[in-house]
């Protein structure tokens, strides 16, 4: 549930935050598994 929201990041228009802050898609859990493969 939240496949579309999680895809972005926190469920907000990360289109700008992701580019401006860069922390929008870097803190979400979706990016976590990518950073540490085999963590799950």
UniProtKB/Swiss-Prot annotation:
UniProt feature, compositional bias: Polar residues: 17-34
InterPro entries, sorted: Natr_peptide, Natr_peptide_CS
This protein's GO CC annotations: extracellular region
Tissue specificity field: Expressed by the venom gland.
PROSITE patterns xrefs: NATRIURETIC_PEPTIDE
Keyword Secreted: yes
GO MF terms, alphabetically ordered: hormone activity; peptidase inhibitor activity; toxin activity
Region (Disordered): 17-40
Keyword flag Manganese: no
Pfam family, one: ANP
Residue pairs linked by disulfide bridges in the UniProt entry: 9-25
Family named by the database record: Belongs to the natriuretic peptide family.
Role summary: Snake venom natriuretic peptide that targets NPR1 and possibly NPR2. Exhibits hypotensive and vasodepressor activities. Recombinant PtNP-a demonstrates a dose-dependent stimulation of cGMP production via the natriuretic peptide receptor 1 (NPR1) (EC(50)=563 nM) in Madine Darby Canine Kidney (MDCK) cells. It also inhibits the angiotensin converting enzyme (ACE).
Something else known: Negative results: recombinant PtNP-a does not inhibit platelet aggregation.
Protein name, UniProt field: Natriuretic peptide PtNP-a
Organism: Pseudonaja textilis (Eastern brown snake)
């Amino acid at each position: 549930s939240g496949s579309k929201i999680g895809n972005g990041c926190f469920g907000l228009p990360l289109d700008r935050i992701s580019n401006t802050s860069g922390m929008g898609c870097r803190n979400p859990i979706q990016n976590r598994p990518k950073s540490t493969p085999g963590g799950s």
